[in-house]
Amino acid sequence: MANNFSQLAKKSRNELSSSKVKKEVIENPPLEIFKLGNDVLRTNAKRIGKVDLDTRNLAKDMLKSMYSAKGIGLAAPQVGISKELLVIDINFEDSAAEPLILINPEITAFGNTLNSYEEGCLSIPGVYLNVVRPSTIKLRFSDEMGRPRKMNADGLLARCIQHEVDHLRGVLFVDRVTSKEDLKTELKKEGFQMKDVFPISQS
């Protein structure tokens, strides 16, 4: 599942400061993660025109904040920045595994096989519900040096990428939950409200 991911990540090793982030929980992470109900989570992110040091430093701060929250993916809108930038690391426990940094990501193809799997979100802490998504995808993006890349992903990595790309379109995983009763129960339990959910068609 992670072969393609690992190859791409290794190409960035020793090149950039943004991937050199220790996988640890720090007391005061650099970025605040905004929660369900904040308007910034519902805006369309803007493409990044030039990948520069500021972009790489933002990715570095996003990784620090993601690791501190014990997450495996984070999108720039979640930290209040409406830019098309994602950081992903599905191997938090493996200190040698490199994170994946996706700039201006675009999913170019979805596989035909769908599966249901429990998802959570750093912007909706404590809420975990099943979401149906394609099990495989094809993706193109720019890496943190601004170089164009393509990759295939499946399993957890494919799901995580789809989840984070949704954030760039103002979509949250709770919008895709089909069991509204379960959703209402889980949101209420964690202090969130149904009025902040915008259901989308699964067809």
UniProtKB/Swiss-Prot annotation:
Cofactors that this protein relies on? Fe(2+)
The disulfide bonds in this chain are none
Query: Per the UniProt record, which EC number(s) apply here?
Result: 3.5.1.88
Q: Where does Fe cation bind?
A: C121, H163, H167
Cofactor binding note of this UniProt entry: Binds 1 Fe(2+) ion.
Name one process (GO BP) from the record.
co-translational protein modification
Coiled-coil ranges per the record? none
**What keywords sit in the KW lines?**
Hydrolase, Iron, Metal-binding, Protein biosynthesis
> Does the keyword Transcription regulation belong to this entry?
no
In its UniProt record, a GO molecular function of this protein is: peptide deformylase activity
Which top-level group of life is the source organism from? Bacteria
Q: Which family is annotated? A: Belongs to the polypeptide deformylase family.
**What is its biological role?**
Removes the formyl group from the N-terminal Met of newly synthesized proteins. Requires at least a dipeptide for an efficient rate of reaction. N-terminal L-methionine is a prerequisite for activity but the enzyme has broad specificity at other positions.
Q: What is this protein called?
A: Peptide deformylase
Which taxonomic lineage does the organism of this UniProt entry have?
Bacteria, Bacillati, Cyanobacteriota, Cyanophyceae, Synechococcales
